[in-house]
């Protein structure tokens, strides 16, 4: 729900920017708030009919099962866009600081990730199952991909949502796609996912 809420707030701002003629030149911005509305209505994270994770079906197949056809349609619809910002849900509960995750970052992509102005950028090496994710397939199709983890999934957090919206608008402004005033944000700390260690408590409680 958090990701859908962020997209709705982002669209509200982008409509005003477009109305004032502040989308620069011939730039186009596409926002896809949700690709599985029925699943959300039932409070499910995966595809409602067969519990499939859509983010494991890319690049999709136009002649495949329904989820695979949806994945294919997303790839076709976003083909040719220079940048792609994915707001993935997270498979674990809890909250965390909003951050950008890069998969096998190419030269310069970390610098671009810093333009979001979030506290952290995580560099990760792709694993075999990443080959079927939206992020990986965008990259293979020539789209600079960023995964923006927004700090919450199943619930709505206004403060974290506002931070995510601001970071996207900041990136679009700094890339010369829109004209919009925003504060400078953070200078990101760049971390390698392989250097992170889980810390487990030995007992319940504080």
Each model region followed by its residue ranges:
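Structured catalytic-domain cores with a bias toward divalent-metal coordination
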Residues: 1-206
């Amino acid at each position: 729900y958090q990701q859908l809420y962020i997209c709705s707030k982002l669209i509200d701002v982008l409509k005003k920017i477009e109305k004032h003629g502040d989308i620069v030149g011939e730039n186009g911005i596409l926002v896809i708030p949700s690709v599985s509305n029925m699943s959300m209505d039932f409070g499910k994270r995966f595809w409602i009919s067969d519990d499939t994770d859509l983010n494991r079906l890319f690049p999709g197949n136009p002649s495949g099962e329904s989820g695979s056809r949806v994945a294919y349609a997303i790839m076709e619809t976003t083909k040719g866009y220079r940048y792609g910002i994915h707001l993935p849900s997270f498979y674990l509960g809890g909250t965390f600081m909003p951050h950008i995750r890069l998969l096998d970052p190419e030269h310069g992509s970390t610098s671009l990730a810093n333009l979001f102005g979030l506290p952290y950028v995580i560099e990760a090496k792709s694993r075999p199952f990443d080959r079927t994710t939206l992020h990986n397939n965008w990259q293979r199709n020539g789209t600079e991909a960023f995964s923006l983890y927004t700090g919450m999934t199943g619930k709505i957090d206004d403060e974290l949502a506002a931070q995510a919206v601001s970071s996207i608008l900041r990136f679009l402004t700094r890339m010369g796609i829109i004209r919009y005033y925003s504060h400078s944000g953070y200078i990101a700390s760049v971390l390698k996912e392989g250097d992170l260690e889980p810390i487990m408590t030995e007992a319940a409680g504080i």
